[in-house]
Each structure stands twice: as C-alpha cells, then as structure tokens.
C-alpha cells in the first residue's frame, strides 16, 4: 500500500517517518521485502535528508497471512469498512481469537472475509477485543501499519468504547458516577479477577439509563482496559451483571450470558484525521429482558 506525506521540518527520512508511526521493524520490511521510499518522486534511502515542503511517499509490501488462523465462513455484520479498517458487530457466543479446539472465532471469520475478497493483506489485526459472551462493536485493522497507528491511540486512551449493561442488586446508583478500584487476579482461579489493593489501577465511569428496581440499565465507559473490568467493578458494588454467574450474576431473567454490549465505538482515523463514530443496537436477548422489566414495572 502507498502512503504520502509532506515534510514540515528538515530531518532524515527515517526520523520523519518515525513521526508518522513507521517503526524500525516496518522500515526494515520496506527496505528488505520489496517496499519503496520516494522523495519528490525519486527513490531514496531512509538516511536521505528531507526539508520543509518535500513530499515523501512510501510503499509498504503486503503481509504474509497468519498460518494459525483458518478462514471459516460466517455472515459477518459489517458496520464499516475501508482500505484501512473494519468494524464488526460481534454476536455473543464467539471468542475474539482461536484457542485449542475452538475455531469458530471472530479472527477466523474475518480471515475468511479477507481471503474470499482477495485482499492483498490477509493478516488479521484485532485492535479492540471483546469477551466471548459480550456482544457489540469490534475494530480490526486491515494491515500492520494501520494497527500500529491505532495501538498509539490505545496507549493514549483516545479510542472510546461505550457499553450497555444490565446489573442487579440493592445498591443505589447515582445518575452518574466513577468506579476507581484496582483489579488483581483471583487467588483461587486463573480465570476470574477481583478488586484488591495489590491489583492494577482500573477506572470505570457510568451513567444510569433506566432503573427497573433491582435491575438497572447503565451506560459504561472504560478508562482502562483490565480483564473483566466492567464485570468485576459492578460485582464489587454488589451489582453483578445479569447472566454473569462467574461473578454472582442472576440467571433468572432469561439471558444466558453476561448482559454486556459494546454499543458505541469512536476513534480518530489516523489517515484522514476525521473522527469516526459507530453505533450498534441492542441484541434481541437484551431487548427481551428490558421489555419484560418494563412490563413488570408498569
């Protein structure tokens, strides 16, 4: 793929490209695997000096596919796609990445999408993951350079994800609030997490959307990305998610997985500098629970 930039100050090409998230590894790939660097239309080395107003163009060679991923057909719900990014509305019940004896995963489904459309880059790059039984928006990069640029936004916490959750308990919630509590591995499990002073800093904010008595619908924003963060934080408040029996959630409301849905995803497209905002409607199982709660409340 070819990208073009205009130089703002005097430096060497490699230093200029570093400012545009071209890593040493990617620069080596350009040099040794068939890529190119041009300055004002002339091919040059990475050490070539450039000056204000010069135009630097690069061609990044195509990537070899992951040998571990299998292209598995699946009717993907594609929310958005361009040359750099793919946004999928993930159904619950599917993990993000494969594991032993579990091939029906979003990574393999996206791999099939890339292969069946004969995309030049067929390596799958997951930018934002979701747990197996969480539904909603997932962001994929369609090549390594796009992934590197989005990793920078992840580090800067400028990718914004909002979740809807149904929680249950007697704890009163304010109209909006913050949960700041460190999360650590559970001493008795390699899977579960807990709030503990030995854990890593974790910050969750929420807004109360609807109150059905013991059950509440909340809109949640993560400021950190700890494993099971939403599930652990709300269980810590005495408000576990419906269907989340791993953290004490009730199975009495007809939802068979944790009631958690990523409904909004916002980020800055690093290539166009435009804000990208994508939305996803609630799933049918979520809607059914809410409808039943509203009926009982009325």
Q: How would you describe each model-predicted region?
A:
Residues 1-298:
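RNA pseudouridine synthases
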